Amino acid sequence: MLLDPELHYLDNAATTMVDPEIAGAIHEALLKDWANPSSLYEPAVETHEALTTARGQIARTLGCQAKDLYFTSCGSESNNLAVQGLAMARKNWGSKIVVSGFEHPSVQRPIHALKDRGFEVVEILPEADGHLDVAKLAAEVDKNTVLVSCMAVNNETGTLQDIAALSTAVKAKNSRCAVHVDAVQAWLRIPIDLKKWKNVDTLSVSGHKVHAPKGIGALFIRDSVRQTLCPPYLGGHQERGLRPGTENTPYIVGLGLAAAKGAKNLSDRNAHIRALNAQLRTGLEELAQQAPITLNSPADAVPEVLNFSTNCVNSQTFIEYLSGRHIYISGGSACDKGEPSHTLMAMGAPDLAVRTALRVSFCGDNTPEDVQALLDGLKDGLKELQHI
């Protein structure tokens, strides 16, 4: 997918390049599916059929019914709809929210806003390896708890949470408590089956993490909680009244194609990415003889994300140095630009490790040459930068 072999893009947790086939499908839909899908004449019916097809493609990757999927503009909007909608719908009988201490800002900040509106918020910090203690979280759930929210895969470390166990434990304590899962970094990276995750009430996904464009996402809402979710917007009937406004058909078509393509070769792609991750880990072990490098991602993290600290060079300095060599990585969440990693701080990482953390995130288009270019850049950078 990359046109320039000298460019090494390793920040796929921030965004992915749009697949040319998906871009082509969007362009075709812009010209072909131009009608308003809510109208009744033939071109509109055909446009509506394109929406239906895409909804089905996405539903098959999540193990849910198509009718339980709602299109949004992005993962952040999906998270806001779920978190605020579920909490506000339950405020007449409860006011407690339990959330992990490493959520994405699009979950963390709406929940803090709910705190300002009278909700009690309890944050559960992870263990040192980034995993949540399910028993510790469940112990905070009581009859007053209206919402529990946890991301499936952490965007900074790749740590994978046991969503099935967590959601089951929550419902065992309070069956009325809603469970929201931010699956933006998990979708099409790990298998998701909402028939097995039967205690998850809402789940968010995003297009630009899976080679579709920015500006499109989706939210799963289990039918059993749909009528108890307060929609923040008022308007037309689109998306069953939850998200009014004429649907962005071309981008929805692109999201559907991304789902179909991503699900088709998930196993092979994961094997390829695991090999890249292993190559990088081996290279970092060798570089650890040159600098006090430590890994922040646990061994069982998803292979797409590897977070480590040099413990000697500021993150921003190293990112700029590597960028000069056309190697692109990050220091953490793109939505917290310039801020120290709240995930690493929640894990109890030392201040130096937080300030020198780097995140590498792969996609199926990355190559061993990308990893070697990064390792060469790290080796040279450690020589040149650690005494600045």
Predicted regions and their residues:
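Pyridoxal 5′-phosphate
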Residues: 1-388
